[in-house]
Amino acid sequence: RVSSAYGYSQAKTPTWDDYKRETNNSWADRTDFHDAMDFMGWFINKTNKINGISKWDAELQYLNYHEGWSGYKRGNHNKKAWLIDVAKIVNARALRYATQLKTCEEELSKGWFWKLFS
């Protein structure tokens, strides 16, 4: 089955159109990294509102992204052991990135001027 997903976000056309309409961002482009990141924030927030998934739960957010909000509600992912395995890998990666960020957060929060003296 051919998908309409492309660009950084790999968003399908109907979902991308919903994003553009709901955010009044009619010029958003799936091949623009900034727009794709804004889309992800929108999608994560909607997933939280629609299915009650924490914005910090990478595993369940991923399953919603892959299966769609209705597919997740129906439990479609429960019939796909491979997908659950991938979602666990996504979650482990998110936890690793969060740990890495904490180790350099202080350095990143310094202004450019103070970085000159580090």
What do the PLM-derived regions correspond to, one by one?
Residues W56-L108:
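Catalytic and substrate-binding regions of cell-wall glycan-acting enzymes that process beta-1,4-linked
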Residues S109-S118:
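Low-complexity, Gly/Ser/Thr/Pro-rich intrinsically disordered linker/tail segments
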Residues R1-V2:
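Charged, glycine/proline-rich intrinsically disordered loops and linkers
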Residues Y6-L60, N64-K73:
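Alpha-helical segment that forms one wall of the substrate-binding/catalytic cleft
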